[in-house]
A protein has these predicted regions:
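Accessory nucleic-acid engagement/destabilization modules that flank
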Residues: 2-194
Length: 194
């Protein structure tokens, strides 16, 4: 069996949590929390994709370096010399945005809902949502969502991700999710129109 992609290493006992286990466990919790809003599928998808970038070789090199684990297959990768973190949330944000924008493309429905969920993923390590607009009202979130694959490693993560994670994400990112999100935002949009 190949070594699992590592999400976390518990300092107290050295126990490794695989990316697959981390994403599935977070998805299960997020689904329960989102139940209060009748947005279980949205919560589950957010949990499943929030750390999708941890499937990248760059993140795996980073976590091995940070934890002192040794993996000779990663030895040719450079570590981050300045101690900076590796972006591991944008890949999931881009994936969700790309998949949801396919729905209701003519009306921009999927685009809008993909932005909403993508922003949640891209912002999950901050102290709130990332800036969505600059001082002039220009869409600043576009910079994050348009980051190159060289920086987000989305294509690599899609190749590396466990099949069970990818299948569940594809299953969740469908019309049922779009309908539930629309039902949730309709009252807000109706209030804006009046």
């Amino acid at each position: 069996m190949k070594d699992p992609y590592i999400a976390h290493l518990r300092k107290s006992d050295g126990q490794i949590q695989s990316v697959q286990a981390h994403l599935k466990e977070t998805a299960a919790l997020a689904k329960v929390f989102a139940q209060k809003l009748n947005l279980e599928s949205a919560g589950e998808l957010l949990g499943l994709m929030h750390d999708f970038g941890k499937y990248s070789r760059k993140f795996q090199k980073y976590i091995h370096d940070e934890t002192g684990l040794f993996n000779p297959d990663l030895d040719d990768e450079e570590s981050t010399p300045d101690g900076s973190k590796v972006d591991h949330s944008t890949a999931g944000a881009q994936w969700v945005y790309r998949e949801l924008r396919k729905f209701g493309a003519a009306q921009g429905i999927g685009e809008f809902l993909g932005q909403m969920l993508g922003l949640c993923i891209a912002s999950h390590h901050g102290e709130g949502l990332i800036d969505c607009l600059d001082g002039e009202g220009n869409p600043k979130w576009v910079e994050r969502f348009n980051k190159t694959d060289e920086l987000t490693h989305l294509a690599e993560c899609e190749r590396n991700a466990d099949e069970v994670v990818q299948q569940k994400a594809k299953e969740l990112a469908g019309e049922k999710l779009i309908r539930s999100l629309l039902n949730a935002v309709k009252p807000i949009l109706s209030d804006q129109a009046t």
